[in-house]
């Protein structure tokens, strides 16, 4: 009887087999932490209100994308309090509720630092976040942004309310705050973790010396250190390779880059029409100069390898990137885009192909730092 029971326990349960077969992603440890995140991570910049940016998906279109992502195994969702002035966080909470997704089965990542629309005059389309340097001159916005103890606790409390959750898995500081002593920032972040409001902390685009300073303060004072860096990194913007990527690799910080496909440029030929509303809007005033000769030549080489291998261009770009990071953050405009990205799973380029893609790169001005 005992032998029969043991044999039954040793069999893989059908429910586990089914779950594995439905999972179309890999899960990797985020830096030296024990937290495992999906590759890719879903980016929440695309979800919110079209009043904020014309290519953002309103709730009606955003909810099915979150459901599809979850069903396929993309259970790590990144957002920020300023995305559509909080609407992105609210829609994520709506998805968890509407589709009865257990909170413990998703990893929620959000960010704070920038100023948001005043709740008393709330406007999801407000561009106040682009003018945080003026906030401290306003009676309504003073102390409502940045990385002070006051601002951090207020931001996290508000994000918890919008996300309808008791904790944030990874709280990321959106940029470095020059106006606050770094010791105050790291102490407050540590206290947020001790209070149970946050599980882990991460950071986003900044200079390496700034990030190293924050990590050094945490280490010397026995405070919680950052486990992730969300920086700007892709085949046509590789300035982070100079210091930040190497520092993170050396110190066990996971890289989760934004803009992995350069607003879609690395997923289509230079002469091809924009594949999304965001791409067409980004053609003017984009981070990526549309007439950069070397950039276009790199993209053309992505197209050559894609044609040779019979892959979409996005798979070539992601195959190059995935060897160098933990997980890229991708904003999906449709369920089809999710499926395309997940089909890149396990694909690798040869060293010769990687060198062919890399050799045309020339240094660029630093983009995305505060």
UniProtKB/Swiss-Prot annotation:
GO terms for molecular function: oxidoreductase activity. Substrate binds at residue 174. NADP(+) binds at residues 78, 204-205, 230, 259-269, 333-341. Gene3D superfamilies: NADP-dependent oxidoreductase domain. Disruption phenotype: Impairs the production of destruxins. Coiled coil: none annotated. The active site is at residue 83. Its EC number is 1.1.1.-. Pfam families: Aldo_ket_red. Keywords: NADP, Oxidoreductase. Aldo-keto reductase; part of the gene cluster that mediates the biosynthesis of destruxins, insecticidal cyclic hexadepsipeptides which induce flaccid paralysis and visceral muscle contraction in insects through targeting the calcium channels and vacuolar-type ATPases. The aldo-keto reductase dtxS3 converts alpha-ketoisocaproic acid from deaminated leucine into alpha-hydroxyisocaproic acid (HIC), which is the first substrate for destruxin assembly by dtxS1. Belongs to the aldo/keto reductase family. This is Aldo-keto reductase dtxS3. The gene is dtxS3.
